[in-house]
C-alpha cells in the first residue's frame, strides 16, 4: 500500500493530517503501519479467510526528524501453511493511494488494484487470464447484490460503507423482529475485526 504524501517532513510545517499521524503521543507506537498497514492486515485476513499467526516486521523511519515509522515491510505466516508479504509506505514518491492486492494459489492467482477498483484479474495456471468487472452477469450473486451502479460506472468508497451499514441494519432488524434466515450471511465488521 504505497503512498508518497509524507516523503517530506510536512508535519513540521503544521500540516494537520501529518502532524497527528507522526506524533507518538497521539498516534501511538506506529505511524505508517498503524495508519495504513492495518487496512492491509484486515484485507489479508478478510480475503483469504485466514488469520495471521506470525510475522517479522521491518519498520523504518526514513524522513529525518520524524518520530514514527513512515515505511514498513512485513513477512507473514497465516493458517494453512500460507505465507504473505505486506508492504506499506507513506514515502513512496509519486504514489497516491496505490493499494494493490495479489493472492497466489496452486491453480491461479487474483489481482486487484485500487486505481482500477471495478476490475478483478483472475490468472490461471493453464488458461488465459479472466477479467471480472462489477455489475456484469459473470460475477457472483453477493457481488451483484452489493453493486449499486450499472457496469462501467465506478463504485465508490462511500458505497462500501453503505453496504456495511445496510448489512448491519438488516441483521439488527431481523434480530429485533426474530426473523431467522440461515441462508443470508450479513457481512459487517464486529468486535473481533
Question: Residue ranges of each PLM-predicted region?
Answer:
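Predominantly a Rossmann-like dinucleotide-binding segment in NAD(P)-dependent oxidoreductases
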Residues: 1-66, 120
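C-terminal glycine/acidic-rich active-site capping loop/insertion
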Residues: 11-13, 17, 21, 46, ...
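Residue-level signal for the nucleotide or nucleotide-sugar donor/cofactor binding architecture
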Residues: 35, 189-192
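Glycine-rich phosphate/pyrophosphate-binding beta-alpha loops
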Residues: 38, 87-95
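Short acidic/polar mixed-charge low-complexity motifs
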Residues: 51, 80-82, 91, 106-109
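Short glycine/serine/proline-enriched coil/turn segments at secondary-structure junctions
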Residues: 63-66, 92-95, 111
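A short, glycine/Asx- and small/polar-enriched loop/turn
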Residues: 67-71
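Beta-strand scaffold of nucleotide-dependent catalytic cores
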Residues: 85-88, 112-113
Amino acid at each position: 500500500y504505497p503512498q508518497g504524501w509524507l516523503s517530506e517532513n510536512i508535519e513540521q510545517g503544521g500540516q494537520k493530517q501529518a502532524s497527528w499521524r507522526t506524533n507518538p503521543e497521539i498516534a501511538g507506537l506506529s505511524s505508517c503501519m498503524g495508519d495504513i498497514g492495518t487496512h492491509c492486515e484486515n484485507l489479508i485476513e478478510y480475503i483469504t479467510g485466514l488469520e495471521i499467526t506470525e510475522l517479522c516486521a521491518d519498520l523504518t523511519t526514513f524522513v529525518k526528524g520524524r518520530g514514527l515509522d513512515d515505511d514498513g515491510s512485513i513477512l507473514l505466516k497465516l493458517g494453512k501453511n500460507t505465507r504473505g508479504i505486506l508492504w506499506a509506505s507513506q514515502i513512496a514518491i509519486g504514489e497516491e493511494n496505490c493499494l494493490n492486492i495479489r493472492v497466489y494459489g496452486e491453480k491461479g492467482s487474483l489481482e486487484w488494484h485500487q486505481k482500477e477498483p471495478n476490475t478483478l484479474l483472475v490468472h490461471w495456471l493453464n488458461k488465459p487470464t479472466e477479467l471480472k468487472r462489477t455489475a456484469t452477469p459473470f460475477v457472483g450473486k453477493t457481488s451483484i447484490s452489493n453493486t449499486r451502479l450499472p457496469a462501467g460506472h465506478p463504485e465508490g468508497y462511500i458505497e462500501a460503507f453503505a453496504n456495511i451499514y445496510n448489512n448491519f441494519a438488516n441483521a439488527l432488524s431481523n434480530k429485533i423482529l426474530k426473523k431467522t434466515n440461515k441462508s443470508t450471511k450479513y457481512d459487517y465488521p464486529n468486535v473481533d475485526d
